[in-house]
Amino acid sequence: PRSTLFPYTTLFRSETQNYARLMQILSDAQENQLWMAITGSAGSGKTFACKQYSRDHQEVFYVSCDPDWTKREFFSVMLRKIGKEPSGLTLIQMKQKLVLQMRCLESPIIILDEADKLSDVVLNSFITLYNDIQYDCGVVMIATEFLFKRFDTGVRFNKKGFNELWSRIGRKCVP
């Protein structure tokens, strides 16, 4: 029952459950090199939980996505996250360096917060990335429900790469 003095008791309990659930999903994804998408409402605590998970665990690379990134900018950010300098490298060399580094780690995970903000071109680059590191690294895309809508629309209208990417994350978004 809700208190009239403190009407948000249910909300905080719900957020705590969301937090615990998301932490467990991230742990499973990291331990088992899972590729998945998780969606939730704005303000549901996704970002907080992901940042906390990245602080509490090793080999976690948290990235807050930007809608203006090109593929080159995305891979530059990824290399910097793993402590490598992208200067002077071609896009192919950046991808190769990221793949090699992920393969050298025991159980890495990349958390892409606000993944729904990434351009189609950047999202499509995950198809080959998946092919290269699917057994070496987990990748979790975190977003609002708009990510599911993008995948759904992309698959229904046969947009380049969406069916392949959708299959690589198990043809679902975890709500």
Q: What label would you give each PLM region?
A:
Residues E15-Q30:
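Pre-Walker A adenine-sensing motif
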Residues T70-V77, E85-S125, N131-G138, K160-G161, ...:
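Mid-core helix/loop region of P-loop NTP-binding domains shared across ATPases and GTPases
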Residues W35-A42, L118, Y130-K160:
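Sensor-1/coupling segment of RecA-like P-loop NTPase cores
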Residues T4-L11:
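Short, small-residue-biased leader/transition segments that mark boundaries at the very start
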Residues Q30-Q52, D66-P67:
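Walker A/P-loop nucleotide-binding motif
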Residues Q58-V60, V155-P175:
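A short helix-turn-beta junction within AAA+ P-loop NTPase domains corresponding to the substrate/partner-engaging
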